[in-house]
Every structure is written in structure tokens, then in C-alpha cells.
């Protein structure tokens, strides 16, 4: 499989990618999935190469999908928590990045602070991938775009995100604007995406000819939506605000009543883990509209594409 390189050495943010990069990732992921479903479980593009996975936050889908992805590409993945490394005892990020670059061919980091991943990339001689930070979740957003196309075609589409303007929402808004898809965010005042992200979303939307809107009414957001997306109300790191967030976001629950205002063809997405009965009810999560498990599966194929394009 011949692969075209991306225009970036790292994947820290969707803002690192132009439209051609995004299309390349989606196209390569499609080829990987087709071959996987045809029974070709190992494609040794990264044979002999190693990926380090560093986790400051817990993970199920990100950890397992990256470990399996490296195996299916013929390489190896080594997983560490921050506390297992000298980072946990105060070693400078600069020194850790420089040293790990001598051992590994790539590093994926899940960190609390986006700035820590940016600093790591600054001193790394090998590709660095953001596996989730407080600002963005680019691997998830690329997977979401892949899943939307798989279910609904190339588009353009209208994506409604109902809930907190968190890392998942930020990256999804950026990828939608990049692809020329309309994005509507239903959110309580004060919980919108960070200004630095939204400015880039608006710039890309203007460039691609798509529309981005922030509304307060979830029913308005889903009325013309092809995709209704939600995520947890209390993200990792927001636990101290739990009770207040549960109160504020209660009217933003994705349930049967809200979905009755969406078009019949609209699909429901969630990056998982789900706090069932809060942001998403069981009857919707387990309905025919829900694509949550396909979405989770696609992390594997999209991340194989990301790894192959950055490390191949």
C-alpha cells in the first residue's frame, strides 16, 4: 500500500490538518477497514517500528485500539502511565521527549494539559499524537467523520452536538468546518467551546462554505440534523463541578422526546464512555439510530491510518 505523507509531522489538533490531510486519513482508513473485513488482519507497513503510549488519564478505547492497531500494522506498542515514568517524579518534559525519541518511532499521549503535549512535540524527534487532552480529541473527531460518511455518504451533512463544549466537541466542530459540513452546538451559556478553538472553526467554515451556530435550545439544534451527537456532562478533570453540571445540562439530555424533533434518518453518536441516564438514555443509545459501537470500532481503522501516515 503506497501512502501519501501528511502535511504535518504531529497530530496534536485537527487544526494541524488541512482538508486534503483529512481526506487522506479517511481514504486510507477506508482501505484498511476493507482489507480487515476481507480477512487481512495484518498489513506490515510498520514492521519493526515501535509506538509508546503514555497515559495521564484512564482509557479503554484509545489504549486498546492503538495497541491493536500497531499489532495489525506489524509493529509494537508499549504502554505506560505517567507515574511509571520519571515524568511522574518531575522530570522535564523536554528531557523525556528527547530520550524517548531515541527509543521509539512514535509517541501517543493522553494528558490533562494540552500544553504538555505541545511541549512534548516541540522536543520530540518522532511523531507525537494527541490521544486526548483538555482541549482536543483529534483521533476521535477523524473517526467520527469516517463513521458519518460510512453511514450517510460523503455529504455535506449537518451535525448537531448537544451538550458541553469539551475536547470532543471542539475537535468535531473543527473537522466538520474543514469538510464543509454544517455544525450546530446546543449548549448552556458559559459552557461553549474555547474561544481559540471557535475562532478557527469559524475561519475554516468560511473557507469551506459551511455554517456554524451556537444555540441554547436542543430542539432547534436537532431539527435539521443528520447527526445528533452528545458526550458526558462531567469530563475527566471536571469532577469538582459534578453537581452543578448535572443540574445545568439536564435539559440537554438526548432522549426519545428530543429525537422526535430530528429527521427520521438522523443517527445518534457518542464517543463513549456513556453515563447512561444522564446525557443519553438507554432507549436512544440502544436504538436502531445509534451507531455508537460502529463508531468505537472505527477508532481502530482510523488510527491505523494515522499511524501509517505519520510513521510509515
Swiss-Prot record:
Q: What class of enzyme is it?
A: transferase
GO terms under cellular component? cytoplasm
Q: Which reaction does it catalyse?
A: carbamoyl phosphate + L-ornithine = L-citrulline + phosphate + H(+)
Is Nuclease tagged as a keyword? Answer: no
Q: Where does L-ornithine bind?
A: 167, 231, 235-236
Q: What is its EC number?
A: 2.1.3.3
A UniProt-annotated Pfam family: OTCace
GO molecular function annotations of the record: amino acid binding; ornithine carbamoyltransferase activity
Places the protein is found: Cytoplasm
Location (main, coarse): cytoplasm
Report keywords, A-Z: Amino-acid biosynthesis, Arginine biosynthesis, Cytoplasm, Transferase
Per the record, the GO terms for biological process are: arginine biosynthetic process via ornithine; citrulline biosynthetic process; L-arginine biosynthetic process
Has the keyword Metal-binding been applied to this entry?
A: no
Protein's job: Reversibly catalyzes the transfer of the carbamoyl group from carbamoyl phosphate (CP) to the N(epsilon) atom of ornithine (ORN) to produce L-citrulline.
Question: Can you name this protein?
Answer: Ornithine carbamoyltransferase
Q: Which organism is it from?
A: Methanopyrus kandleri (strain AV19 / DSM 6324 / JCM 9639 / NBRC 100938)
Amino acid at each position: 500500500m503506497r501512502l501519501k505523507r501528511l502535511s504535518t509531522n504531529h497530530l496534536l489538533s485537527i487544526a494541524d490538518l488541512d482538508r486534503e490531510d483529512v481526506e487522506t486519513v479517511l481514504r486510507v482508513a477506508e482501505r484498511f477497514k476493507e482489507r480487515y473485513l476481507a480477512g487481512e488482519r495484518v498489513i506490515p507497513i510498520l514492521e519493526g517500528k515501535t509506538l509508546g503510549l503514555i497515559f495521564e488519564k484512564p482509557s479503554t478505547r484509545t489504549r486498546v485500539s492503538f495497541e491493536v492497531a500497531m499489532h495489525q500494522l506489524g509493529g509494537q506498542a508499549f504502554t505506560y502511565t505517567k507515574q511509571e515514568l520519571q515524568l511522574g517524579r518531575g522530570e522535564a518534559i523536554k528531557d523525556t521527549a528527547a530520550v524517548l525519541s531515541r527509543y521509539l518511532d512514535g509517541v501517543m499521549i493522553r494528558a490533562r494539559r494540552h500544553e504538555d503535549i505541545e511541549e512534548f512535540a516541540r522536543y520530540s524527534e518522532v511523531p507525537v499524537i494527541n490521544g486526548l487532552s483538555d482541549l482536543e480529541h483529534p483521533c476521535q473527531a477523524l473517526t467520527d467523520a469516517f463513521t458519518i460518511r460510512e453511514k450517510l455518504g460523503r455529504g455535506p451533512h449537518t451535525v448537531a452536538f448537544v451538550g458541553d463544549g469539551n475536547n470532543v466537541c471542539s475537535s468535531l466542530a473543527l473537522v466538520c468546518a474543514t469538510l464543509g459540513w454544517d455544525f450546530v452546538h446546543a449548549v448552556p451559556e458559559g459552557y461553549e467551546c474555547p474561544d481559540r478553538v471557535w475562532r478557527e472553526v469559524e475561519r475554516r467554515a468560511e473557507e469551506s462554505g459551511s455554517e456554524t451556530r451556537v444555540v441554547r435550545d436542543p430542539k432547534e439544534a436537532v431539527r435539521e440534523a443528520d447527526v445528533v451527537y452528545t458526550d458526558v456532562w462531567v469530563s475527566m478533570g471536571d469532577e469538582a463541578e459534578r453537581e452543578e453540571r448535572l443540574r445545568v445540562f439536564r435539559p440537554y439530555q438526548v432522549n426519545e422526546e428530543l429525537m422526535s424533533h430530528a429527521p427520521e434518518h438522523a443517527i445518534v453518536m457518542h464517543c463513549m464512555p456513556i453515563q447512561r441516564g444522564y446525557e443519553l438514555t438507554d432507549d436512544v443509545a440502544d436504538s436502531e439510530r445509534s451507531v455508537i459501537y460502529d463508531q468505537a470500532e472505527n477508532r481502530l481503522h482510523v488510527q491505523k491510518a494515522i499511524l501509517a501516515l505519520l510513521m510509515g
